[in-house]
Amino acid sequence: MSNCFFDVIANGQPLGRIVFKLFDDVVPKTAANFRALCTGEKGYGYAGSTFHRVIPQFMLQGGDFTRGNGTGGKSIYGEKFPDENFALKHNKPGLLSMANAGPNTNGSQFFITTVVTPWLDGKHVVFGEVTEGMDVVKKVESLGSNSGATRARIVIDKCGTV
């Protein structure tokens, strides 16, 4: 199992670190994409990108490092890659799952659940979970709104593997 981290800031102020365990054994291709985007080893990735959509009692979405508004991003396999499988369910808060625009449109955008979200099962690939820093997830969640607009610029300041 790989572990990755995000050091998160809001309007330039540190919020703390989120650590993720990736489910390499179940979704190796999806996990490898996220890990490489955390390390920046391909020359691009999550460092400096924002959580552009945050909905309290639902999720935090980020990973659009090309446009910053939810319309961009790219994977290490090209712009998009197929859904690997739907073996893991959205059955608890703190899960890491791929955001998409329909079947087989995974790129770099991801979301972190803050509640159980079973309606996403079979549509979004779960590939990891928060192991440390759920308090940081909650801080980010508190800066969101029902529309998803954020009340601060929430940035992944640093990221990588641990």
From Swiss-Prot:
Please state where this protein is localized: Cytoplasm
- What is the E.C. number? 5.2.1.8
User: GO CC annotations?
Assistant: cytoplasm; cytosol; nucleus
All copies of domain PPIase cyclophilin-type, residue ranges: 5-161
GO molecular-function terms, A-Z: cyclosporin A binding; peptidyl-prolyl cis-trans isomerase activity
UniProt keywords, alphabetically: Cytoplasm, Isomerase, Rotamase
Q: How is its activity regulated?
A: Binds cyclosporin A (CsA). CsA mediates some of its effects via an inhibitory action on PPIase.
Q: What does this protein do?
A: PPIases accelerate the folding of proteins. It catalyzes the cis-trans isomerization of proline imidic peptide bonds in oligopeptides.
Q: Please give the PANTHER family that the UniProt record associates with this protein.
A: PEPTIDYL-PROLYL CIS-TRANS ISOMERASE, PEPTIDYL-PROLYL CIS-TRANS ISOMERASE D-RELATED
According to UniProt, the name of this protein is: Peptidyl-prolyl cis-trans isomerase
* The species this protein was found in: Schizosaccharomyces pombe (strain 972 / ATCC 24843) (Fission yeast)
Gene name linked to the record: ppi1
